[in-house]
Amino acid sequence: MSEKLVINCVGDSVTEGMEMRGHHASGYGEASYPAQLYTILKDNGYENVEVNNYGHGGECYNEIVSRIGGVATVISESLTVPDNAKISLGVRKRDKGKTTGTKLRLCYEDESGEELCVYYTQMSHDTNPVTINGTQYIMSVENDNENVIHKMYTDHKETIIPAGSVLFTANKRNPDVNIIFGGVNDGESFTLKRFTELTQKCAQVNGGKYIVLGSTNAVFNDWGDVKGDTAEEKYKYYRKICLDSFGIHFIDLYDEFSKRGLDIAISAGYFKNITDEEKSVMREKLLRHIMPSEFVYDKKSENNVHLSEEGYHVIAVLVFERLKLLGYLNQEGGV
């Protein structure tokens, strides 16, 4: 019997599964893409498998990278944590997707010279307890976008945290496979270069077994360094850079939904009550890279990054296929 295969799905609300049945979870039969991936694996005989939904709604790529552990997160200034009291890690401010105002920094610098602040939006099983210099703390969100910490096990002593101390979150840092899906919250402050460099660092955390999911819509049009005068030119540039950076580890959801999304959903039994004419309209929209409302969580808006159960099923199938093609699966569920 091989060891259990552990898959971490790390990202923001599109991984969490906004307003989905069993959101922020990966239980059998639930609706988020990690849960549907787990269901597909179990239904295909992969019994010895664990899929973790590490999606945090509202987080930017800095936080996703931090939680994976691809780049260290450090305390930016010396902190004194009093006995039995909380201390602030700063209040998050945002401008065009950029986070400022926190006392947590990603240890990464590109040619921009910007300091990359970190702010965790959720304090669930993959965040708490955080560990700094061997001491465990509980982190929380209080007031207006303020991260605070207090000692988990009090010894009735004041604690000094020197500037530059590394913070570890509680998630499993050495899964067999990391599936990375993010970037929808970063806006104009983000760049494709930063996305690829940070993701490549995350890819090495567990020895290089990873999958990168591209966005289902054109969020990359907002990133500062994506070249092209038209939307199509920008997409081709984004796709080329991602394929060059990640090779066959990259799943281009923008393209896959256009070519295969509807057929995958129909094959799984979805859209039985939709007419052939309505399906033709959906297919035409997908070919033009428009996400139909039937694939969106509220069934109303088009092109929303937050998908419905049907949309997340498509992602789960594509990930399952790629796990097999990359040789990450065997029938016993191990690696």
Language-model features: where?
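Short histidine/acidic/glycine/proline-rich micro-motifs that form metal-
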Residues: 14-17, 55-59, 185-187, 217-219
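Catalytic nucleophile-elbow at a beta strand-turn-alpha helix junction centered on a G-D-S/GDSL motif
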Residues: 4-23, 27, 31, 57-61
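A short beta-strand-loop structural module common to alpha/beta enzyme folds
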Residues: 44-62
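Alpha-helical cap/lid subdomain in secreted, periplasmic
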Residues: 2-3, 31-47, 65-335
